Regions:
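Contiguous beta-strand segments within globular domains
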Residues: 2-16, 155-165
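Short proline/glycine- and polar residue-rich coil/turn motifs
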Residues: 49-57, 196-205
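Asparagine-centered strand-capping/turn motif at beta-strand->loop junctions
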Residues: 14-21, 168-172
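Short, hydrophobic beta-strand segments
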Residues: 57-101, 205-216, 221
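Aromatic-Pro/Gly-enriched surface loop or interdomain linker
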Residues: 233-315, 346-348, 368, 452, ...
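A glycine-rich, often tryptophan-bearing local segment used as a flexible ligand/cofactor-contacting loop or short
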Residues: 317-397, 446
Length: 473
């Protein structure tokens, strides 16, 4: 990629199936660069294409990226996940999947007097291990990218100091200095109040701020990270998405953290293990509660000391993604029997044989997708719903996208069902949160999409998770 204010040397390679020449049937009349997105980049020709007696030639140009160059990004945007639709940033591209890339090379021929133009986006070439040479369209990105590890989370009410780490990346080919600071809610302070960075070309650095919330209540707060360099402010970062064979594109995120003050109690001495499945950010969310789980490897499942953990969480669809999990199911059940807590997040049908007592999803897996539905608490005084936080129907308010999937259809009498919810026209679903005492420990199955709610800082999801991992305390 390139950044505003930089130069790029572009080689345009032109070839044809036959020779061209002045006055011949096939003539190459000109080669040039253009900006399909409507920008104007100053271009200097360094080496002209040959128009005589050949069927292949190169033209070389220097393209200067203006300071106000349009960044390569989607022409549509959505300010937050609460908004159900996208807004059009640039109506010129409304009938296209993406806005055009910023620079293209063109050649014009005449064949028997008929003009023919051919063009291609300008591409950069690099090598990837295992793939080899890969060509990607040239893109324009900001000089500095500002990123946060997460964009939403909780701050337990009563917290006096809370860390927030900001990563600043220099995407230019020159060393840059930058000053980083946070825009905080009124009355909040941080230390340091700013951070000075010396960034190498392509380099990145972290700054961790100790944030001191004042008057923290059960509401949303917004914190923005800003990096200043060369008299300009930068307050967003981007991810490059795509893979070999699919043109990459660039998705931007504002460097904004949405913090939610939450009344939550979490035992301070919990030790938690996590078995990652197909991928989620639950371990990071647990960190916001002061719990820093250990990611368990296949070797840990086979021979590790599981008894050191107060609770072990099984990630979403882990029984499908981790063969070692099913192979060592008895070790996990032994861990529960000896006093541990095993929390199984939503799975597919294959996990049923790994439970201590019979349970199943049934022939048709039940999902509950209307997050506006009401969740009924069936056993409000059950310890799992009272310790250390009292869970009520209000903890299921404000959920995003869905309540959950893979609700159980059948379960043994050893299990207790704690909640009920259903979509309109659907039979009541009580298989979303069930648990059983097994030996000295507790086995829990939860199909509620906690992993999705934790990402969005939904207070009730954190409070419920705190109760689940505390079940053995």
């Amino acid at each position: 990629w390139v950044t505003p204010g930089s130069d790029a040397e572009v080689r345009v390679h032109v070839t044809a199936a036959q020779d061209w020449s002045n006055g011949g049937t096939l003539q190459l009349t000109r080669v040039w660069l253009a900006n399909p997105n409507g920008d104007h980049w100053p271009v200097t020709q360094l080496d002209a294409a040959s128009t005589q007696g050949t069927n292949a030639t190169d033209a070389v140009f220097r393209a200067s990226v203006p300071d106000d160059a349009t960044l390569t990004r989607p022409y549509f945007t959505r300010p937050n996940t609460e908004q159900a639709h996208y807004e059009i940033r640039d109506a010129r591209w409304a009938e296209r999947p993406f806005a055009p890339y910023p620079l293209a090379g063109w050649a014009e021929f005449t064949y028997d007097g008929v003009p023919v133009r051919v063009g291609q986006v300008v591409q950069t070439v690099h090598r990837e291990h295992g793939t080899g040479q890969v060509a990607w369209p040239l893109a324009v990105v900001p000089r500095l990218s500002v990123n946060l590890a997460a964009h939403a989370g909780i701050i337990p009410i009563g917290t006096e100091t809370w860390p927030l780490t900001v990563t600043v990346r220099n995407d230019t080919q020159k060393a840059r200095t930058a000053e980083v600071h946070l825009k905080l809610p009124q009355g909040w302070t941080d230390s340091p109040d700013s951070g000075s960075l010396q960034l190498a070309p392509g380099g990145a650095q972290d700054v961790t701020f100790a944030v001191h919330p004042k008057g923290l209540a059960g509401q949303n707060y917004e914190i923005e990270a800003v990096a200043t360099s060369g008299g300009k402010d930068f307050a967003e970062g981007f991810d490059q998405v795509g893979y070999a064979g699919l043109r990459p594109y660039y998705l931007y995120q504002p460097a904004t953290y949405r913090a939610r003050g939450v009344a939550i109690q979490v035992p301070s001495d919990l030790k938690v293990g996590y078995i990652m499945g197909t991928g989620d950010d639950v371990p990071q969310a647990l960190g916001e509660m002061g719990i820093h789980p250990t990611l368990l490897t296949d070797a840990d499942l086979a021979t590790g000391n599981l008894d050191q953990y107060n609770a072990i969480l099984v990630g979403i669809r882990a029984y499908s993604a981790r063969p070692a999990l099913m192979a060592n199911k008895q070790r996990l059940l032994n861990y529960v029997h000896q006093g541990g807590t095993l929390i199984v997040q939503y799975q597919r049908t294959e996990f049923g044989s790994a439970a201590p007592y019979p349970l199943s999803l049934g022939n048709e897996v039940e999902n509950v997708v209307e997050e506006s539905d009401t969740v009924h608490i069936l056993q409000p005084n059950d310890p799992l719903l009272t310790t250390p936080n009292r869970i009520t129907a209000a903890d299921f308010d404000g959920w995003f996208e869905e309540f959950g999937h893979s609700f159980l259809s059948n379960w043994d009498a050893h299990y207790s069902a704690l909640t009920e919810v259903h979509d309109p026209g659907q039979a009541p679903q009580r298989g979303g949160l069930v648990y059983a005492r097994y030996g000295k420990g507790t086995y829990i199955y939860v199909s509620y999409a906690l992993y999705r709610q934790l990402d969005e800082a939904v207070p009730g999801a954190f409070r419920l998770m705190a109760n689940l991992i505390s079940a053995g305390k």
